[in-house]
Amino acid sequence: MKKTSSFQNGLIWFGAAVSIAEILTGTYFAPLGFTKGLLAILLGHVIGCAMFFFAGLIGGRTGLSAMGTVELSFGRIGCLFFAALNVLQLVGWTSIMIYDGALATNTVLGIGKWVWCLVIGGLIVLWIAIGIKNLGWVNKIAMAALFILSIVLCVVVFRGGTPATVPDDSLSFGAAVELAVAMPLSWLPLISDYTREAEKPFAATLSSTLTYGVVSCWMYLIGMGAAIFTGEGDIALIMVKAGLGVAALLILILSTVTTTFLDAYSAGISAESLSKKINGKYAALIVTVIGTVCAICFPMDDITNFLYLIGSVFAPMIAIQITDFFLLRRGGARGKLDVCNAVVWVLGFVLYRVLMNVDIPVGNTLPDMAATMLLCVIAHKLFPDKARAA
């Protein structure tokens, strides 16, 4: 089997991080002001990327897909449950990314949002058809172009240097941290789909984590800077006013395609976990078509509640996986259902939703994960028999 290098994995996650969704999420941080906003972005990404790293390392060391690693901790039924939720969130992400990309490109060249949805959807289909292992030269060209164009965009946003907005209290620091955690958290059910095929699992996971973390912070910073220094939250409009033209189109289309490809591709892999009869590549193509249709038909302008929902589902899930694999070192399959871990996950999910009503400076994810990990350790010490397959 052809293995991927650490450099290739880094390129994949560079493409994932450069996205309109990340820039748009960054605009939400403007009410904090530049210094507090930057601190919230950095703190949130440190928390989120730590989980991202451990999730990827489990896949790299076991050679299992993301949902395969979930089965190690939750059993077959648990795997099916999270695989179904993951497919749903990835269909959602595919729709959101195509919607945002089409809306932005239509600002640059107004031929109709639905036309751009079809163009972007078609390019994602092409990416899937080429395949993750054959994207080498295509990815290198796309990433080089995105890197240069992102620098240009950064210069355009920050060259004014004078804030056009005044900080206010509409967003708390803790809520901002949670928005920063949410983006790397949303990739947790995907990263093992790529690190499992790495030549050097640890190096590839570290490369993926550092690349994604740094570039994602950069995208958030561009979004926040745009809102603070230009008073404009529409990145496409900023690029049009700066006269970027074709460069703007390239940024918007390439960033959308390279990110959304990962969503659709991993949706296909997760779908394979639901049934052996499902072909991952065909499933990914179907997800892309569904995402394109949804992007044409439905408005998707505010994704904050979607991000919080992802956090409440996957933060306690990865907390249990980390505890199982690295602390308790429980290896092997869990049969149909690991009842102990399933109950702990439900408690972790409920706790996250409760914590959403509490303003915590470090956000909800960190305390929720700490509590879930502690509950997991205690539960397996008190009820070792219940940890066996049900």
Q: Where are each of the predicted segments found?
A:
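C-terminal membrane-solvent junction of multi-pass transporters and transport-like membrane proteins
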Residues: 319-390
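Extracellular loop-to-transmembrane helix junctions
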Residues: 27-56, 78-80, 367, 371
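Transmembrane alpha-helical segments of multi-pass small-molecule transport proteins
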Residues: 12-16, 82-87, 108-130, 144-154, ...
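Hydrophobic transmembrane alpha-helices that form the core helical bundles
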Residues: 78-111, 257-273
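Membrane-interface loop-to-helix entry segments
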Residues: 115-157, 167-168, 205-212, 307-319, ...
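Juxtamembrane transmembrane-helix boundary signature
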Residues: 42-74, 81-87, 380-386
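Membrane-interface "cap" regions at the ends of multi-pass membrane proteins
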Residues: 1-28, 32-36, 48, 134, ...
